[in-house]
Amino acid sequence: MTSEVVIDVQQKDISIALMEDKQLVEYQNEPREASFSVGNIYIAKVKKLMPGLNACFVDVGYERDAFLHYLDLGSHFNSYQKYLKQVQSDRKKLFPFSKASKMPELEKDGSIQNVLKAGQEVLVQIVKEPISTKGPRLTGEISFAGRYLVLMPFGDKVSEIGRA
C-alpha cells in the first residue's frame, strides 16, 4: 500500500488530502490565517544566539521572534537538519523519508552555538503559543499527533495512547 499526502496552498485556504493507493482516505480544508497554533511546523531562520541562556531567537513569521532553548532541540535534531537540506536541494522532486539517514544524537549538555548559527534555517514546531509581549516557544523534536498514536520521525520507541 502506498500513502501520499497532497497539500494545496491557495491565497485564502489550505487543503490537505491523504491518499492510499490513489484513493482519497481523508480530506481537510482550513482557512489560511496567520495564527501561530501549538503543533504548527515551520522552516524558520535563526535570528540571534543567546549563549548565556543556551538558546536562540528564531523568526517564524510572527511579529516577535520565537524562543528555542538548546534542550528543546531534541536528540534527533541533526537528523532533521540533514533531511531538511536533502529536501531543499531539489524542491521539484519529492525526497522519500525512507531514504533519510539517521545522524548521531545531539549531546544533552552541549552548547547552542556549537549547533546553530545566525541565519541558519531550522525545522521547528510550536509548543507554546505567543503570550502578551513574548513570541511562541519552539521545539526541534517534531511530532505528528493522530487519533491513536503520535509519530515522532527518527524515534526508536513505539508507544500507544491509552484511553480509560
Language model feature labels by segment:
Residues 1-163:
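Single-stranded RNA-binding surfaces
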